[in-house]
Design a protein with these regions (language model features):
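Short amphipathic, positively biased membrane-proximal segments
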Residues: 1-324
Length: 324
């Protein structure tokens, strides 16, 4: 029996086509927008940055989900062994207890994504909520002596976890949610100094966009005549920092409100978890030149962090990619 040319390849891409269709499906956008507003309104304070993973340098949600997933997977293995139902039930309970904090971390990240990412993210959350419900039912069955039903609902829960993980992987690796969108800058910008314009082209205190080796660069001139330069596309989701606001030595992304220190690109406030690549600057014969700084930024002390927050405000940025 012959196969159509490319038939196997088409079959392999069916799931991808379904996921691409999910990204474009706007029917749940009203629900998504309402949930987004609710998550943004949570009074989390500085805990919001901790949940984003700013302290870790990348999103903390993937780290936190290891506890519930690992617990539930281990419970499934123990369910295959006679006489281990008590230990399996304990692991189901541990997974349920850890699911809440992991979900909260995922929610604060999700609320600051583009519309297409949030659509897939809603399906990811629904699958995980189904898993929690099934494991909750599994725990009840186990406690009430219905071990067989507990094992069965646990396996259904593990299936839902797998579906949620697949959707989460699509968000992370195909849609690049949570990725550092400025990571390629050191690999694209050539070494040495690059002339970007005459001094008079840069008004004091106003962000200006220039390009170096096809990489957009944010340039800010201080009132004293000194210059700062950072990669212009925000590390969070590539927002245009040149359209953001500048205050007290920091620039605020206009899309989701991430704040970066102009002197070295340090991410003072999230949702960005990675700093901006920074450039050294100099003036030669009336022209501004920049050179990519190869060493990373230094973390600010508490006083510097508080000053930057006071200068840039505590609200998130605009609703780029959102209809909320």
């Amino acid at each position: 029996m012959s196969k159509k040319p490319g038939g196997r390849r088409m079959g392999q891409n069916r799931m991808l086509r379904l996921l691409d269709a999910l990204e474009r499906d706007s029917r749940a956008d009203a629900v998504i927008d309402a949930l987004t507003r609710g998550v943004r309104a949570l009074p989390l304070g500085r805990a919001r940055d901790a949940l984003h993973g700013r302290w870790l340098g990348h999103p903390v949600h993937p780290l936190m989900v290891q506890v519930p997933i690992g617990s539930w997977m281990s419970a499934a293995v123990l369910d295959l062994r006679p006489g281990r139902s008590r230990e399996a039930g304990l692991l189901v309970g541990v997974g349920l207890a850890a699911a809440g904090p992991a979900a909260l971390a995922g929610a604060v990240d999700w609320a600051e994504l583009h519309s297409e990412q949030r659509r897939v993210g809603l399906a990811h959350a629904v699958a995980n909520a189904a898993a929690v419900a099934l494991y909750g039912a599994s725990l009840v069955c186990r406690v009430t002596g219905r071990a067989g039903a507990g094992r069965a609902t646990g396996l259904l829960g593990l299936t839902a976890v797998g579906l949620g993980g697949m959707l989460g992987g699509h968000m992370a690796y195909r849609q690049a949610s949570g990725a550092n969108h400025a990571e390629e800058v050191p690999h694209v910008v050539g070494a040495g100094w690059h002339r970007i314009g005459a001094v008079e082209e840069f008004p004091a205190g106003r962000p200006v966009r220039r390009t170096v080796d096809d990489v957009p660069v944010l340039v800010v001139r201080e009132p004293d005549g000194s210059f700062h330069a950072l990669a212009e596309r925000c590390s969070h989701l590539a927002g245009p920092l040149s359209e953001g606001s500048v205050a007290d030595g920091c620039v605020r992304c206009p899309w989701h409100g991430s704040v970066f220190r102009l002197s070295d690109g340090w991410n003072v406030r999230g949702p960005a978890t990675a700093p901006q690549p920074a450039f050294d600057t100099r003036v030669v014969d009336g022209y501004v030149e920049v050179s990519l700084r190869r060493q990373g930024p230094t973390t600010p002390g508490p006083a510097g962090h508080e000053a930057a927050e006071a200068a840039t405000g505590t609200e998130r940025g605009g609703d780029h990619g959102h209809s909320a």
